[in-house]
């Protein structure tokens, strides 16, 4: 009957044994590694740069500012209107200084101009992307990434031929427009080589 007692004592001692962090106080906490902090900072900076250069992201960031500016503009306009009405009626207006309506209106127009530029830039990028996909739909392999060559990629000599054909077409269009303008104005000038000069 004495045998179960050492086993029970062993079980109780085993259950009471704790790790080095629990018996001797709190264990060492994991500190963030410097590489993780640097990586997160670099990713945040890269994301901020992408937002600055991307017109769509810039547009999304400016929309809340435009709403807030419009609300401020309406509020300032109402306050100025109430004050002017009180002055016209001979009533005493509040002595609190009011915001200038022209400054708020100028800020609102500045945000509108920025939004217009973002939309124009986004439209221009979309047009260039569509033109690139239309006139040069295949990819061109680069010498720095030979492994990234795709089966439908365009060889570089053939790509140069396509570019030269596009330049020739642009020159022909420029010459035709110049001749048309000269005929309309009645002027005769020497034939121009067009944009870019000779190849």
Curated annotation (Swiss-Prot):
Its main location: nucleus. It comes from Mus musculus. Component of the Mediator complex, a coactivator involved in the regulated transcription of nearly all RNA polymerase II-dependent genes. Mediator functions as a bridge to convey information from gene-specific regulatory proteins to the basal RNA polymerase II transcription machinery. Mediator is recruited to promoters by direct interactions with regulatory proteins and serves as a scaffold for the assembly of a functional preinitiation complex with RNA polymerase II and the general transcription factors. InterPro entries: Mediator_Med29_met (IPR021018). Residues 1-17, 28-47 have a biased composition (Low complexity). Component of the Mediator complex, which is composed of MED1, MED4, MED6, MED7, MED8, MED9, MED10, MED11, MED12, MED13, MED13L, MED14, MED15, MED16, MED17, MED18, MED19, MED20, MED21, MED22, MED23, MED24, MED25, MED26, MED27, MED29, MED30, MED31, CCNC, CDK8 and CDC2L6/CDK11. The MED12, MED13, CCNC and CDK8 subunits form a distinct module termed the CDK8 module. Mediator containing the CDK8 module is less active than Mediator lacking this module in supporting transcriptional activation. Residues 1-47 are annotated as: Disordered. One of its GO terms (biological process) is positive regulation of transcription elongation by RNA polymerase II. This is Mediator of RNA polymerase II transcription subunit 29. Residues 18-27 have a biased composition (Gly residues). It is found in: Nucleus. GO terms for cellular component: core mediator complex; mediator complex; nucleoplasm; nucleus. The modification N-acetylalanine is found at residue 2. Belongs to the Mediator complex subunit 29 family. The gene is Med29.
């Amino acid at each position: 009957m004495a045998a179960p007692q050492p086993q029970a004592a062993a079980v109780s001692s085993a259950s009471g044994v704790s790790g080095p962090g629990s018996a001797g106080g709190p264990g060492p906490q994991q500190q963030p590694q410097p590489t993780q902090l640097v990586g997160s900072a670099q990713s945040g900076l890269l994301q901020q740069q992408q937002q600055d250069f991307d017109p769509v992201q810039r547009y999304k960031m400016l929309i809340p500012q435009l709403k807030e500016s419009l609300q401020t503009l309406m509020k300032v306009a109402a306050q100025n209107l109430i004050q002017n009405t009180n002055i016209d009626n001979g009533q005493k207006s509040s002595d609190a200084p009011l915001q200038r309506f022209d400054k708020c209106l100028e800020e609102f127009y500045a945000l509108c101009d920025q939004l217009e530029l973002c939309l124009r830039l986004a439209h221009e990028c979309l047009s260039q992307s569509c033109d690139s996909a239309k006139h040069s739909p295949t990819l061109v392999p680069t010498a720095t990434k030979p492994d990234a060559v795709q089966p439908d990629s365009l060889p570089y000599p053939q790509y140069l031929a396509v570019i030269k054909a596009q330049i020739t077409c642009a020159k022909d269009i420029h010459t035709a427009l110049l001749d048309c303008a000269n005929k309309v104005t009645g002027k005769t000038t020497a034939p121009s080589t067009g944009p870019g000069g000779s190849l």
